[in-house]
Amino acid sequence: MTKTGMQEQLERLRDEAMKRKVEFAEARFASVTSSGLMLQDGRADRMGAGKRAGMGVRVVANGAWGFASAESTEFGDWFSCLEAAIEMARVSAQRLDEPVLLADVPAAVDEVQAEFEIDPTTVSIERKLAAVQGYEEASALRVGERVANLMTGYNDARHLEIVCNTRGTLVSSESVRTMVWHAVTTQDGSIRQRAQEIRAQQAGFELVEATPAEELSGKAAALALSLLSAQPAPAGKFPVVFHPSITGLLVHEAIGHNAEADHIVAGQSILEGKAGTRVTADCVSIVDDATIPGSWGSYRYDSEGVPGQRRVIVEKGILKGFLHSLETAAKMGVAPNGSARADGFANRPIVRMSNTMIPPGEMSLEELISDIDLGLLLRAGQWGYVWCEKGQYTCHAGEGVMIRNGELAEQVRDVSVSGMTLETLANVSAISSDFELEMPNNCGKNGQRMAVNGGGPYVKIKEIVVGGQA
């Protein structure tokens, strides 16, 4: 069925919902055509392609939510979902503590086309495999006998989402995302080191064609090799400078999740009750911006049909706002800001980040480190996790560089940092004019995965706990 046909069916379902006197109804069609493959040590470890399409319908009836979905494009199946959702809502209403309220937002009627040069759905799997093999072979050649493991992956997805609700919104959004990545583990005796590089954008297969091996697998291989001869990082408290990749990891894990308003209303965030107060150093601002062209985490409309926006979380140290759905905005008495996203048709929209970052400052990296007698520069952000309600976080860096007498010195390995979120951000003393937004990821929350990105400038912390070798 054509996109126009899907829109007409959604409008028809919306009209049926209105006949049944529900307070609110939202019908959302979603389809994805995707492919992916992964090589491991020269072998095809995973290859696949597929297409899924279906519809999910949410209703508010008697003050309660109901939801049902079907992997189908048949109107009869959609109508059955509507009836099931209404029945669920009315049963739930009998056990309701407080009725569902949704914030008002102007109705949107729009169609968004995907922007790309080479449609990945038209590129053969053989061509995709050849590109991935080229990346892996370049890394193997660079690493030689010190290779312990090579992994190279490619994924693409073409999405269509159509949102239609009883408030007059009818929004169709298309997007194409492509990702390629390489991870290499090197070994020298008992020492093993890992490095990885990722390129991911809202783009087609042209992303792969514009990414030479030396910028992806070659870069990862060079780092993994150099780390074999590096000494372990020292453990203790030090002044630390974060590379933009570590900055992105920190703001995503430590602030971004805490700023999701569903965590606020559930009492699971350290930012609860702190709106309008100082939560970071004066030099720190934090934004989540869904409007950046081509970025992995961007979108024109969220899964409730609300325009994506640039959302200010922290401005010059003051907590200004949170990421909201229609429901959380109503609960907190603020305007919605387009932060509700759903992973496919079978999931309900929940509050999610997009591109989360600290905006750049005015200092150079050289100026940032000039007064540090002994400290560390952390680069190559790899992973992190956060306990939202406790305000604790851990971030692991793929590489560290010692700072001695105001200058970059020797490379170190096996370094991580941990601390209390607000304490760390209060100890930021300077940020750089250099800026990167290159931490694309598929973030998991409540069983849903969503495209997000993160980044920022170099950030100087007065003192932080570094995990290494004592």
Task: State each model region's role.
Residues 1-470:
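N-terminal small-residue-enriched
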